[in-house]
Amino acid sequence: MSERYYFDIRSLCDEVSDARMRAERFDELQTLKLRRLKELCGRLPEPSEAFFIETQKSFSAFTFIVYLMRTAGRIRHLYIATYSTNERIINALLRWQSQGMIGSIHLHVSETMQYRMPAVWQRLMQLHQDGVLRLTSAWSHQKVACIDTEIGRFVVEGSGNYGENAMYENYVFLRSESVYRFRAGLDE
């Protein structure tokens, strides 16, 4: 009986050696169960600090953008990778951009959005064509925000989309230049 292998270990080693790898040590890790972000009392992660958050009441990933604008001030650049969003979120981002609270915006969305949410997709395409924001898409289920502010670069990632969410979601909220660059695709 011949043995069958699912992969060749030598080719796997070559593949791993070509992979992008990043390592960073986080000095502080906080675990929090929150009903709302206000419970952080204006606290932001320090450099190389990460908050692991579990929601106890429904709030979306978008809430972090609002929280950062209130505590850190103007957002110079906002990169959002998401599976889903809605008109209300898009309108809020555009309003803040027109008020100068947000500089440039890059939305990276799931390419399935054009089938699942055709009106939202068309609106985003038009905004991209008009030069209001940058739009990219891929077969993706990511939920990440990279937020560049005057006081530092923050990353939020977790299970929540930029729209309606379940009561229980999980997020990692951190301040790190290298993770920001990695998640925003700036160091490729």
Regions of interest found by a model, annotated:
Residues 38-41, 60, 81, 89, ...:
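Aromatic-residue detector
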Residues 61-128:
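Primarily the HKD phosphodiesterase
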Residues 54-55, 108-110, 135-138:
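Conserved beta-strand termini and adjacent loop/short-helix elements that scaffold enzyme active sites
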Residues 78, 132-185:
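HKD (HxKxxxxD) catalytic microenvironment of the phospholipase D
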Residues 1-75, 98-99, 148, 153, ...:
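N-terminal localization/anchoring segments of enzymes in phospholipid and broader phosphate metabolism
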Residues 52-58, 82-85, 133-134:
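Short, flexible loop segments at the rims of nucleotide/cofactor-binding pockets, characterized by
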